[in-house]
């Protein structure tokens, strides 16, 4: 019971070609009513654009606060920092002369969550879940790009027969800004 109110979680995903990898570590402090969580995440993705190979590195840091009003309702705030680097593989004279692209992003996300569901077993839920959220991301450099997203997600799972469940989902979102999402 020494770490009953504290959690340390880590994870990784390594691809077969060892080029696209992800690493994550999380620390949660749950000993007061206001829960705190810090998440560090690193992702490396190898991709091809035209005739050139790129490697994208993304380092993200999240600070998450959760305030439960009761067992079913909570308010969540997430502060985000993200630093992206795009590196072109040196295959010829042109690609060797290209400089790395670097972008910094800062963001905030506010969520209201209603969750009356109960997990019966892995991926089998019964009950209702509703989330309403708004998120703002701002690129920290000369371009001054930003993104605002607002949306909702509602899910309902009901028992049909024994362990059979009927799940229904309704969701939607809209985004605005100089750097909109492409669906």
Predicted segment positions?
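Structural signature of outer-membrane beta-barrel channels/translocons
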Residues: 2-3, 26-32, 64-74, 82, ...
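Short, glycine/acidic-rich beta->alpha junctions
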Residues: 17-19, 57, 146-150
């Amino acid at each position: 019971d020494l770490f009953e109110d504290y959690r340390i979680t880590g994870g990784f995903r390594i691809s077969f070609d060892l080029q696209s990898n992800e690493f994550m570590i999380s620390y949660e402090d749950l000993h007061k009513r206001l829960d705190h969580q810090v998440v560090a995440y690193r992702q490396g993705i190898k991709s091809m654009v035209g005739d050139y190979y790129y490697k994208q590195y993304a380092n993200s840091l999240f600070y998450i606060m959760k305030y439960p009003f009761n067992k079913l309702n909570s308010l969540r705030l997430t502060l985000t920092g993200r630093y992206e680097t795009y590196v072109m593989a040196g295959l010829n004279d042109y690609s060797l002369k290209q400089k790395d692209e670097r972008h910094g992003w800062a963001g905030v996300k506010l969520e209201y969550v209603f969750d009356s569901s109960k997990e019966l077993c892995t991926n089998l839920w019964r009950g209702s879940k509703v989330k309403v959220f708004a998120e703002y991301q701002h690129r920290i450099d000369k371009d001054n790009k930003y993104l605002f997203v607002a949306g909702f997600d509602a899910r309902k799972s009901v028992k049909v027969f024994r362990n059979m469940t009927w799940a229904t989902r309704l969701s939607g979102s809209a985004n605005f800004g100089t750097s909109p999402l492409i669906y």
